[in-house]
Each structure stands twice: as structure tokens, then as C-alpha cells.
């Protein structure tokens, strides 16, 4: 299914969720189904995890390179979490939107709240069914230490409180159901006449 063409500026969608909620999986499903939807690739100063590819999963750069980009105002938004920077290229997002592509930023709630003040976008929060289920998912993906999982769970509680500032909330209890809701939001927002009511 196509959503628009190159004659209309693409929309901006912000998707946030605690780590392990399935936000990246859901966004990847959208990108696979809709040729005019593209997910932004964030810059980060953290080391790649096993199997991650520079330029596909993230742009992995040094802290000094990241700070130079901050000084040059290259980021649409950026945050520092757990001593690691994450940021979104301002220029890349604008180019994609001018080409008529709908851009999805998968970012944390801090970055999303920054953007609410700066640009028109649709904000979507993905919620886990429970914190216990989230803990199980984080343990089962086996990418982080128990100490980091505990930090992520503490952060998740704060992120869940930020959901009230989003336009939509989806509970990811069943991946296919959550995807159908996310897909419906994307289609409805594309057909919206005006964001300002």
C-alpha cells in the first residue's frame, strides 16, 4: 500500500516505548509494508551489540564526534542516557520528508518531549502489558546485564508516566494486534485534513 507520493511533504511520526516493548519490531513491519515509510537511523556513542551494523541499526560515532554535531546544531533532537548519547539528524529527516517519505523516529520520551515543542508530528507510545512482562522480555533477549536491565526497568517507570503527553497509546500484548493498531494510526494520520483542529 502506498501512502501519498512525491507531491506532498511526508509526515513525521514519533514512536517511543521502554526498551524491550517491541517498538523497533513494529516500526520495521510498517517499513516493510509501506514503501513511502522510512525509519530514521539514530546516531549513538555506545558500542555496537552483536549483529548490529553501522549505518543500518545506528550510526556509531565517538563522544567527541557527537559533541561536535551538537555544537553544529546537526541534531533535530538528542539525549544522553546511561552515559550514552543518542540523536537524530535534522538534515536527513528534512530531506526524506521533502521527498514525500513519511519518517518514523524511534526515540525515547526525553527526545520526544523536546520535539513536541519544535515540530508538528504524530506521537505514538507503545506500552508493555506489564512491568513484569517487560522484565521477562529484557531477560529473554539476552543483550544486557541484570544491572542494566534493572536500570532500564527503573527508566521504564518514568517513561510510562510520559505516555500521557502522546497522541496515541498502543499496548503491545500481541504483536499482530499492536501492529494493526499502529498501521491504522499511520493511515488515519495520512488522511487527516489538518493537524490543527
UniProtKB/Swiss-Prot annotation:
Q: Give UniProt keywords alphabetically.
A: ATP-binding, Cytoplasm, Kinase, Nucleotide-binding, Transferase
Residue ranges of the Guanylate kinase-like domain?
10-187
- What Gene Ontology cellular component terms go with this record? cytosol
Q: Which residues bind ATP?
A: 17-24
EC annotation from Swiss-Prot or TrEMBL: 2.7.4.8
Reactions listed under catalytic activity: GMP + ATP = GDP + ADP
Q: What is its main location?
A: cytoplasm
Q: Where in the cell is it found?
A: Cytoplasm
* Molecular function as annotated in GO: ATP binding; guanylate kinase activity
Gene3D superfamilies cross-referenced by the UniProt entry = Guanylate Kinase phosphate binding domain, P-loop containing nucleotide triphosphate hydrolases
Q: Which domain of life is it from?
A: Bacteria
> Which SUPFAM superfamilies does this UniProt record tie to the protein?
P-loop containing nucleoside triphosphate hydrolases (SSF52540)
Which Pfam families does the record match to this protein?
A: Guanylate_kin
Tell me, what does this protein do in biology? Answer: Essential for recycling GMP and indirectly, cGMP.
- Describe the family membership recorded for this protein in Swiss-Prot or TrEMBL: Belongs to the guanylate kinase family.
**HAMAP family, per this entry?**
Guanylate_kinase
Q: Which NCBIfam families match?
A: guanyl_kin
Protein name in the entry: Guanylate kinase
Amino acid at each position: 500500500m502506498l501512502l501519498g507520493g512525491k507531491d506532498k511533504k511526508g509526515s513525521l511520526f514519533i514512536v517511543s516505548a521502554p526498551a524491550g516493548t517491541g517498538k523497533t519490531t513494529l516500526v520495521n513491519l510498517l517499513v516493510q509494508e509501506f514503501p513511502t515509510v522510512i525509519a530514521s537511523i539514530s546516531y549513538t556513542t555506545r558500542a555496537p551489540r552483536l549483529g548490529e551494523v553501522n549505518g543500518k541499526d545506528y550510526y556509531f560515532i565517538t563522544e567527541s564526534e557527537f559533541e561536535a554535531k551538537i555544537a553544529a546544531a546537526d541534531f533535530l533532537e538528542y539525549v544522553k542516557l546511561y552515559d550514552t548519547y543518542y540523536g537524530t539528524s535534522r538534515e536527513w529527516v528534512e530531506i526524506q520528508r521533502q521527498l514525500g517519505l513519511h519518517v518514523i523516529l524511534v526515540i525515547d520520551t526525553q527526545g520526544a518531549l523536546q520535539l513536541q515543542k519544535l515540530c508538528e508530528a504524530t506521537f505514538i507510545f507503545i506500552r508493555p502489558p506489564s512491568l513484569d512482562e517487560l522484565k521477562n522480555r529484557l531477560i529473554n533477549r539476552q543483550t544486557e546485564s541484570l544491572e542494566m536491565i534493572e536500570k532500564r526497568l527503573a527508566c521504564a517507570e518514568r517513561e510510562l508516566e510520559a505516555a500521557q503527553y502522546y497522541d496515541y497509546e498502543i499496548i503491545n500484548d500481541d504483536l499482530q494486534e499492536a501492529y494493526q493498531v499502529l498501521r491504522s494510526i499511520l493511515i488515519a494520520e495520512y488522511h487527516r485534513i489538518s493537524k490543527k483542529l
